[in-house]
UniProtKB/Swiss-Prot annotation:
The species this protein was found in: Hordeum vulgare (Barley)
Regions crossing the membrane: 183-199
Location (main, coarse): plastid
Reported function: The light-harvesting complex (LHC) functions as a light receptor, it captures and delivers excitation energy to photosystems with which it is closely associated.
Subunit structure: The LHC complex consists of chlorophyll a-b binding proteins.
Protein name: Chlorophyll a-b binding protein 1B-20, chloroplastic
Stated family: Belongs to the light-harvesting chlorophyll a/b-binding (LHC) protein family.
Gene name per UniProt: LHC Ib-20
Amino acid sequence: RIQAYRFRTRVPPSPAASGSPRSTRRDVAVQAKGSWLPGLQSPAYLDGSLEGDNGFDPLALAEDPEDLRWFVQADVVNGRWAMLGVAGMLIPEVLTKAGLMNAPEWLRLPGKETYFASSSTALRVHMSSTYVEIRRWQDIKNPGSVNQDPIFKSYSLPPHECGYPGRVFNPLNFAPLENKEKELANGRLAMLAFLGFLVQHNVHGKGPFENLQQHLADPWHNTIIQTISGQ
């Protein structure tokens, strides 16, 4: 069971409000976070109690509680990977343009296509990551079931919220609700940015920083409108 932080702050009723003075926990969450589209009623299963929940699920993909548990963790993990990926795509290009290093282009290296490692190394990495992902899936299905190290029995994790193991994975104690909200918001932006970088490179054959420089040099002509129109 994924433990979800819920708002417990009392919200005093407005003097102009009419009707029952009682307020539910969902009412507090909605007032605190708001909806992703003003005036649109959020689904009943998205009551604002989860971090980053603004009622966005137009296709009702998370209506099933088991699916919702999986999507919550997928949102966190994919956002973390996206933040690392965006940094890995952007920072080397910026440092190369600044003359501080000479990093190869992140998507296309000169000459024939190359890969980051040999086939045997890639296989070992794949097998290791598969093992880690299986353990993560087990923790989602049965929280706490993978806290004990299966090999070194003297090592174990303390009870924790799924997706937030703490200790060495959280040395600065970024666990309070505000930081979880920020992590999710930045992770979602990073996922969109990652997709944008790929599209830009596919259209222009250039990196995101170079595209930004060209836009700033001539903001009235180097835009998406000119790109779509073929000018």
